[in-house]
Design a protein with these regions (language model features):
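Catalytic-core helical/loop segments in enzymes performing group transfer/polymerization on anionic/lipid-linked
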Residues: 1-699
Length: 699
């Protein structure tokens, strides 16, 4: 099966359409030999689709009308937003009530109880997060951030998410507020909804009649603000109607009105989700089912449905969804979760000083930190004084004299390649309490592990992450090709000792007694005199980028065998124990089901999952592995996809790295490193706010 089209616009979206529809898309030109399973596609009911539709009829082939879904984009398509849904209707199209559509058929089909429950959960998430068609709306300074509950949205008087001027204007009167929704003149959804421009006038008259003492608010269409398109009602002289043309989140406006009047706008559907009375003066897809006050009728829509049944059809079953990071089809809940990850509160600080960052780090630090402050300032040393709306951010344990600074470090699933070879991190941990590897003082991660309640859903997610990590064998750096390892046939216990970089901050601040690879090997040999000790040096040491070599005497006495370019994940199935000072490999080994002994105090020690030579006194809680994994990989770090600029989940990064495979552990040449540095210099100088810089209002 293949798809064919003559539309250049559709072909331009080939990379997103193909995974959503699950078949290749081709340009229909010249003599094409079609098979009986092929499908011709066009975009909605645009005039240029008539030819291809007639072609399909002449050939006896199916014809699908394509459209954006109702949760359409992360960002706005005019500003590089990412498409996340597609409708492919083989019957008609949802906005044309003059003929049947697949959506109409789905709405009329009874749902299983499980599907209705799923739809109810989805409604709750859409309302809680403010998910809409174009998810591109910023918060405003001084807005109130409510609890995030669904009920918070329906409280009239909570003006969070509205521009301050509009919020002030709306609070000037206690009268009922009725929202009239304008649309672009000539929009195909108007005649498709059995309506005309006269129905907009009738809508205003009905609102006046039904609510004689109310304030009538006319919401203009966003596309009319620049003057390139005109609205049906906005051009009329309506003395008793207040124009609302402010750029604001649709839900922020919907939550402060008492009813919604529309002809065929999607705002009416979103009004239903928010529990508002909706009056329809056309026949949009959500009208005619007993959920709206309708001025028109459609004979085909002769059953009453519940809101969950409407949502199940319109948002779960009808559109196809795309994970824009992985480029593969997904479910609506996954898209909602991706959108939710882009939600960031308004900046906490006016100015954030990033101290001592090299030029190549500045580009990726901007991406990870821009949501924290209105202004990022890269400086060589900390400022002497800070105002109440300023903060300092430093790398790791640098500037230990700073008490309240944010400390940043690589995440636990970092990249495909070494940081010392200038591979950008896909994950960072930004900690306002301390830093996770410094066991001398508390950290944000330690506080999460000590005190954060982990729900059953979160434990299940932790278990799923463990299974995913075991399946794909993803680690922090993902260097060294997976190779076969032949376990020594000497009958002895096989103990893997993982080396680190001598002088590493995690050793100096997190290992009170054992502080070098050589000391570690001597300690393990003393504890395990009969074991076969397998030693794996740190990749940076192998690459020649850092120090950490051991003496010949230690090598002869303490090490039975070494591995260099075999990844740790290839060794875990064969070893009986892993010993380390503070290496992340201990955490990775726990995930892979290996017994772990720590000689320092890494973040994963002290929770009852490891054997600890020096257990940390502050860590009194006992955690299941799934909770440790959830809090460490989900709750603590931030993840970015550099291709799309989106905040992502650890699951997405794991799958992405698994697709990419492993990189070489060899040191990059000086020329290669300079090429990378120059690229980052250019990016730093030319950088503009990335797609992830938009923020959604929390209600």
């Amino acid at each position: 099966m293949a798809l064919y089209t003559g539309s250049k616009g559709i072909l331009a979206r080939k990379n997103s359409i193909e995974p959503m529809l699950g078949c290749p898309l081709h340009h229909m030109e010249g003599a094409v030999s079609f098979s009986e399973n092929d499908v011709l596609v066009g975009w909605g009911q645009k005039a240029n689709t008539n030819q291809i539709k007639q072609k399909a009829q002449a050939l006896g082939l199916p014809y699908w009308q394509l459209e954006d879904g109702f949760i359409g984009y992360i960002g706005h398509p005019a500003r590089g937003g990412k498409a996340v849904s597609l409708i492919a209707d083989p019957v008609g199209i949802y906005y044309d009530a003059r003929q049947p559509s697949q959506l109409e058929q789905l709405i009329a089909t009874p749902c299983e109880p499980q599907m209705l429950e799923r739809a109810e959960r989805l409604i709750g998430e859409l309302v809680r997060l403010g998910v809409t068609k174009y998810n591109c709306y910023a918060t405003y300074p001084g807005q109130s951030i409510a609890s995030g509950s669904v009920t918070a949205l329906s409280v009239v008087g909570d003006y969070g998410g509205l521009p301050s001027g509009l919020a002030t204007r709306l609070q000037q009167s206690a009268k009922l507020r009725i929202l009239l929704v304008d649309q672009v003149a000539g929009d195909l959804s108007i005649p498709g909804a059995l309506a005309s421009e006269a129905d907009f006038v009738a809508m205003v008259e009905a609102a006046r009649r039904n609510h004689p003492d109310a304030r009538l608010l006319l919401r203009t269409h966003p596309d009319t603000r620049l003057g390139k398109k005109r609205g049906v009602l906005a051009r009329l002289n309506l003395d008793d109607v207040e124009i609302v043309a402010d750029h604001c989140h649709p839900h922020a406006l919907l939550k402060v009105v008492d009813a919604v009047y529309t002809v065929s706008s999607q705002l009416g559907f979103e009004g239903l989700l928010l529990g508002k009375p909706v009056y329809c003066f056309g026949m949009p897809f959500y009208a005619g089912w007993g959920l709206t006050h309708d001025s028109k009728q459609c004979e085909r829509r002769n059953v009453k449905v519940s809101l969950p049944q409407l949502v199940a059809a319109a948002l779960i079953c009808y559109p196809r969804y795309l994970d824009p990071v992985l480029g593969q089809r997904c479910e609506v809940e996954e898209v909602v979760a991706i959108i939710a990850r882009q939600i960031k509160p308004a900046p906490r600080w006016r100015r954030l000083y990033l101290v001592g960052f090299s030029l190549w780090k500045r580009a990726f630090m901007q991406a990870f930190c821009h949501h924290l402050a209105e202004e990022l300032c890269f400086v060589s040393k900390p400022p002497k004084r800070l105002t109440g709306d300023e903060q300092i951010l430093v790398w790791g344990s640098r500037h230990p004299d700073l008490v309240s600074a944010i400390r940043v470090e690589d995440g636990f699933i970092r990249s495909r390649g070494l940081g010392s070879n200038l591979c950008r991190p896909s994950s960072l941990s930004l900690d306002p309490v301390g830093i996770y590897f410094d066991s001398r003082t508390p950290s944000g991660l330690e506080q999460l592990l000590n005190y954060q309640r982990v729900t059953e859903v979160e434990v299940k997610r932790g278990d799923a992450l463990i299974a995913l990590l075991r399946e794909h064998r993803v680690s922090k750096y993902n260097v060294g090709e997976p190779q076969h390892y032949a376990k020594p046939d000497d009958g002895r216990e096989l103990v893997l000792v993982v080396g680190q970089v001598d002088g590493d901050a995690s050793i100096l601040t997190g290992s009170p007694h054992i502080r070098s690879n050589e000391q570690l090997l001597w300690a393990v040999r003393a504890a395990k005199p009969e074991a076969h000790i397998l030693y794996k040096p740190h990749p940076d040491v192998v690459a020649g980028n850092r120090g950490g070599m051991i003496s010949a005497a230690c090598l002869a006495e303490c090490v039975d065998s070494q591995v260099l370019d075999i990844g740790l994940t290839s060794l875990y199935p064969h070893v009986d124990e892993l010993h380390t000072m503070t290496s992340l490999s201990g955490f990775e080994a726990l995930v892979q089901g290996v017994k772990v002994t720590t000689w320092g105090q890494p973040f994963y020690s002290g929770w009852g999952l490891t054997t600890d030579a020096n257990p940390p006194a502050r860590r009194q809680r006992r955690l299941p592995l799934a909770a440790l994994v959830y809090l460490t990989l989900v709750a603590y770090p931030l993840y970015i996809d550099w291709q799309t600029g989106l905040w992502i989940s650890p699951e997405q990064l794991i799958r992405q790295l698994a697709k990419q495979g492993h990189s070489s552990a060899q040191k990059a040449s000086r020329w290669q490193r300079w090429q990378v540095k120059l690229g980052y210099l250019f990016q730093t100088l030319m950088q503009r706010p990335a797609p992830l810089s938009f923020r959604f209002p929390r209600f």
